Amino acid sequence: MKLLPSVVLKLFLAAVFSALVTGESLERLRRGLADGTSNLVSPTESTDQLLPPGGGRGREVLDLEEADLDLLRADFSSKPQALATPSKEERGKRKKKGKGLGKKRDPCLRKYKDFCIHGECKYVKELRAPSCICHPGYHGERCHGLSLPVKNRLYTYDHTTILAVVAVVLSSVCLLVIVGLLMFRYHRRGGYDVENEEKVKLGVTASH
């Protein structure tokens, strides 16, 4: 508790000292600025001192030269802007044109959507006209014609002759099999009849 008054006094003294220092520095700055403004001389006054008495024409010449210089500076500063602005506009137009060309859609998707009946549409830029890629079995400008398969006569003739030969061979084989079975049966019957006749003869002789 005893330290608090001493700390407060120290802070108060430090604040007073800083206020005094800042006030002195501000006064010094003000004095320096006042001295500088009093020593400065305007350029018109210096030129007036250099010019002889009665030199009004010289002043007019200097004023005209300064005005010409100002005009030249203004023209020089404005010309690059005039040259630069058209180039930017032209670049923007070119970019827009390029974007427009890239966004062009295929005419086959809209205008010639139903041009090809049995095929796919393809737009030829060189001819500026659509063309069709026909599906297999169709032909024509719009793939509207159906192409029928053409049979070869020689091929059909060979096919029929082969079928006829096969039929004849199969029929002949069947006939041979049937004849063989009949002959086998006939021979078997003949042997059976001979045996029966012999048995009959033996029975007759035995009865006697």
From Swiss-Prot:
The chain crosses the membrane at residues 162-182. Glycans are attached at residue 85. Growth factor that mediates its effects via EGFR, ERBB2 and ERBB4. Required for normal cardiac valve formation and normal heart function. Promotes smooth muscle cell proliferation. May be involved in macrophage-mediated cellular proliferation. It is mitogenic for fibroblasts, but not endothelial cells. It is able to bind EGF receptor/EGFR with higher affinity than EGF itself and is a far more potent mitogen for smooth muscle cells than EGF. Also acts as a diphtheria toxin receptor. InterPro entries: EGF-like_dom. The keyword Mitochondrion does not apply. Residues 1-23 form the signal peptide. Keywords: Cell membrane, Disulfide bond, EGF-like domain, Glycoprotein, Growth factor, Heparin-binding, Membrane, Secreted, Signal, Transmembrane, Transmembrane helix. The gene is HBEGF. One of its GO terms (molecular function) is growth factor activity. Residues 104-144 form the EGF-like domain. Residues 37-49 have a biased composition (Polar residues). Interacts with FBLN1. Interacts with EGFR and ERBB4. This is Proheparin-binding EGF-like growth factor. It comes from Sus scrofa (Pig).
